[in-house]
Amino acid sequence: MSAASVSKVVVVFSGGQDSTTCLIQALTQFDEVHGITFDYGQRHREEIEVAKSLAKRLKITSHKVMDVSLLNELAISALTRDAIPVSHELMENGLPNTFVPGRNILFLTLAGIFAYQLGAEAIITGVCETDFSGYPDCRHDFVRAMESALVQGMDKKLEIITPLMWLNKAQTWALADKYQQLDLVRHHTLTCYNGIVGDGCGDCPACHLRKRGLEDYLQNKAEVMASLDKATATGKPQA
């Protein structure tokens, strides 16, 4: 399915840097942009109110908040249990302790059902394989498998668009700046695992990744913007 044939999309929208940047871009490309946010009892559930506020501010077509608290019951993680501190070290299985098993499987499934009801042709999600947190459900192969499952399971043409898949964090900041929304993304989104808007706590892994990317972009704007244009043009991982 070509982008030209898509007019109505559903954005998986957490209120964080990545999904907000995807939402901003979608508003320039599609006629109808619908957001869906998931409340799974997450540690940083302040992001839900941030998502609501941003949805109104950016004037998207509609915004749905879904209660998926069953995920909290099933998936034990530092993001679903306040008693488990966020760690900078990997667990024995090689994954961060902030990994929530099945989260993106559930989110994309529900977003697919929502898209079906709306008659939307695509789902947009801000997952990224190039500069990511080590989550297996952020990988390109996973997304393509989910897309195939949704198409076959609902007998409907449906594309999962991943604008950030092959971008690093600096390039994601550049993308927000390209749409003149760098300040909004920097100061009004919530990426921090401890629920602090903007630059966050500065200590959790999410804040470290976000800060490092921002510093890289601000120090090398022209170079990063050029690399963004190249990555966007090819749609492939950069050497």
UniProtKB/Swiss-Prot annotation:
Pathway: Purine metabolism; 7-cyano-7-deazaguanine biosynthesis. Keywords: ATP-binding, Ligase, Metal-binding, Nucleotide-binding, Queuosine biosynthesis, Zinc. Its cofactor is Zn(2+). It catalyses: 7-carboxy-7-deazaguanine + NH4(+) + ATP = 7-cyano-7-deazaguanine + ADP + phosphate + H2O + H(+). Its EC number is 6.3.4.20. It comes from the Bacteria. One of its GO terms (molecular function) is ATP binding. ATP binds at F13, S14, G15, G16, Q17, D18, S19, T20, T21, C22, L23. CDD domains: QueC-like (cd01995). Pfam families: QueC. Belongs to the QueC family. Catalyzes the ATP-dependent conversion of 7-carboxy-7-deazaguanine (CDG) to 7-cyano-7-deazaguanine (preQ(0)). This is 7-cyano-7-deazaguanine synthase. It comes from Shewanella sp. (strain MR-7). The gene is queC.
